Amino acid sequence: MNQNLPFQQQQRQFLHYLRQPRVAQLPAGFAPERLSVYADLLYNKFDESLAACFPVIHRILSPTDWRILLLDFIADHRCLTPYYRQIPDEFVQYLQQERDRTNDLPFLAELAHFEWIELQLSIAESESITSKPLTREQLLSGVPVFASVMQLLHYQWPVQDIGPHALPAEPPATTGNCQNNCRLNS
């Protein structure tokens, strides 16, 4: 009972073409122009979402390198979630665990993780710790309270400083002072 029905075979060919339109064989029964529209829609939707979630990566990569990265992600990664809003998390997992990093910027996976956590924390719901500013006396006599939404992260690369004009070629030497710790909170 493990046979593929003809429509299932056609669906698999269609999906294979959408994932790899440059190399996949055109499925029978489809007009090339129509398939091209679907492939472009898929790429554009991923581009729109991931460029918004990873703005630094989008800015530091050339348009060609960004396009190659997204096309590789679409072709190679099998998302485990049907939810569109979780695609950026899948993208980070792809960069960390699946992608051949030989030709990538050496800090790409760490930067993607940093940008994704930063975005998640910025939109996370949290209760205000105080409704009014504290006086100096209250600050000194009170018990410190951490923000309810916070992450302490450590990276090999100074991801919080990376941008179009700050692209390190080597990770900084560690001096024992944990200089690449990042505290993120909303």
Protein language model regions, located:
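N-terminal, charged low-complexity regulatory/assembly segments
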Residues: 1-125
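Hydrophobic packing positions characteristic
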Residues: 75-186
